[in-house]
Amino acid sequence: MEDFAQVYGLYPEKKYNKVSYTNIANMILTLCGEKGLTEYIRRLVFNILVGNGDMHLKNWSFLYPDEKTPVLSPAYDLLSTAPYLPGDNLALTLVKTKQMDLCTVDVFKALARKANLPEHIVLSTMKITVEATRDNWSTLKKKYTLRSKNNFCH
């Protein structure tokens, strides 16, 4: 496994610097094709939706199943930083912003343009991910809602 700080030749302390989500998107399309790009956009959108401000370079990785061709590793470190860091921003820049609440369809259109990505893949993946996350959350929130502190220890 090779995390993206290693891919870009950066020391771990630079995991929040030097590279943007736009750079990563272009690299993934180049190395992993449309399938890899679709998965990357899916994860990026999901992390924005759940408020994960910690998707830095060491939380994205490649695996090399044939020892030479990279594929995105399974997702890991998916969490919401929002409850712990109100107002938290993205770990890396997405087009010209780190503010999650500014990550609109227009930002993803700009991502497609800047990174030379197929816009239809970016936008359709974004739409599908938003809908799936909302649909699943309405079902799952009943199961995973935090208990009140009064009955948590009982």
Which residues make up each language-model segment?
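Anionic ligand-binding catalytic core segments
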Residues: 1-57, 61-154
